[in-house]
UniProtKB/Swiss-Prot annotation:
Assembly information from the UniProt record: Homotrimer.
Job description of the protein: Water-soluble antenna for capture of solar energy in the blue-green range. Peridinin is an asymmetric carotenoid.
Native species: Amphidinium carterae
Protein name, entry field: Peridinin-chlorophyll a-binding protein 3
Pfam families: PCP
Keywords from the named record: Chlorophyll, Chloroplast, Chromophore, Light-harvesting polypeptide, Plastid, Repeat
Length: 323
């Protein structure tokens, strides 16, 4: 079909560029991760919200297929010094993404092109050192693929149905997981609301250094995350995504980007239920999958040791309820 043909031509044209790129040690990518949200935090938060909203208009089966394609590509990439996937896996990822995008709401997806701060500068940096002919050929194939996706668009027709609670509706937990999630939220919210999510030095430092410091560890961590997601209930994933969208909308109205208490609780409950649907062994492996994760958590809770202890106890109880 049109997407298959166009995505193959796009992959053929772009792989020579992709395989020359050092995905693990790129200063351009590391700099963007470190600087983009810090330079324009509100736009970055809005972009994440738009990204999640667009994801909720996509066909869940095609989203799952794209996740699986990325996971397979990472399996081959981690054995490459530059974290470059095989040409076959690279092509499979591009086709899966094209089909997934074709299922999205066209207007919402189009808005993503300019949603992230300084994304044009990042793209320019990535292509600056490439052969001009190769870059032009890649861009032409990208335009052709864009046209094929546009022609195949179903404009969100297969989007999942999500039951939306009115913002005025109070959060009422139900069942053992719900009650444990409520206690966890009550114990952790006093800590969370004191954090400045716009300018937190601990989070900025982690984002700036984790992937560039140890890319060979970060890539397997992402791969394991994708593998775990493939074992989860899709409806519960959708509910967790929607809970985050709702929380971000409320957080954007506060100086430190802190979500409202009820939205924070809804996010925790949605995540707990989603995690409860995952393969237990695969999820447990995530606890130590990302480099520096334990150090980040210690830094975030160091300012409030007494509250942190109480929060940890409710976390243990929530974990028991979920598992």
């Amino acid at each position: 079909d049109g997407i298959a043909d166009a995505s193959k031509k796009f992959s053929d044209a772009t792989y020579p560029i992709a395989e020359k790129f050092d995905w693990g040690g790129s200063s351009a990518v590391a700099k963007y991760i470190a600087d983009a949200s810090a330079s324009n935090p509100r736009q970055a938060a809005l972009a994440v919200e738009k990204l999640l909203e667009t994801g909720l208009t996509m066909d869940p089966k095609l989203v799952r297929a794209a996740v699986a394609a990325h996971s397979k590509a990472l399996d081959t990439a981690v054995s490459n010094p530059k974290l470059v996937a095989s040409k076959e896996d690279f092509a499979a990822v591009n086709e899966a993404l094209a089909r997934m995008i074709a299922s999205a709401d066209k207007q919402k997806f189009a808005a993503l092109r300019t949603a992230f701060p300084e994304s044009r500068e990042l793209q320019s940096s990535l292509f600056a050192g490439n052969n001009g002919y190769e870059a032009e050929k890649a861009y032409d194939s990208f335009k052709a693929l864009t046209s094929a996706v546009r022609d195949a668009s179903i404009n969100g027709a297969n989007a999942p149905v999500i039951a939306e609670a009115a913002r005025s509706e109070r959060y009422v937990p139900d069942g053992p997981v719900g009650r444990a999630a409520k206690k966890f939220s009550e114990a952790t919210y006093p800590i969370m609301e004191k954090l400045n999510w716009v300018k937190s030095p601990e989070i900025s430092k982690y984002l700036a250094t984790a992937s560039s410091k140890d890319p060979k560890m970060m890539a397997p961590g992402i791969d394991k995350t994708l593998e775990v997601a493939l074992t989860m209930n899709q409806n519960l994933i959708n509910n967790a995504v929607y809970a985050h969208v709702r929380a971000i909308k409320g957080a954007l109205n506060t100086p430190g980007f802190v979500a409202e208490r009820d939205d924070f609780a809804r996010v925790n409950l949605a995540l707990a239920k989603m995690i409860g649907s995952a393969d237990p062994a695969k999820f447990k492996a995530l606890l130590t999958a990302f480099p520096g994760n334990a150090d980040l958590q210690m830094a975030l809770f160091a300012a409030n040791p007494e509250q942190a202890k109480a929060a940890y106890e409710t976390f243990v109880a929530l974990t028991s309820a979920v598992v």
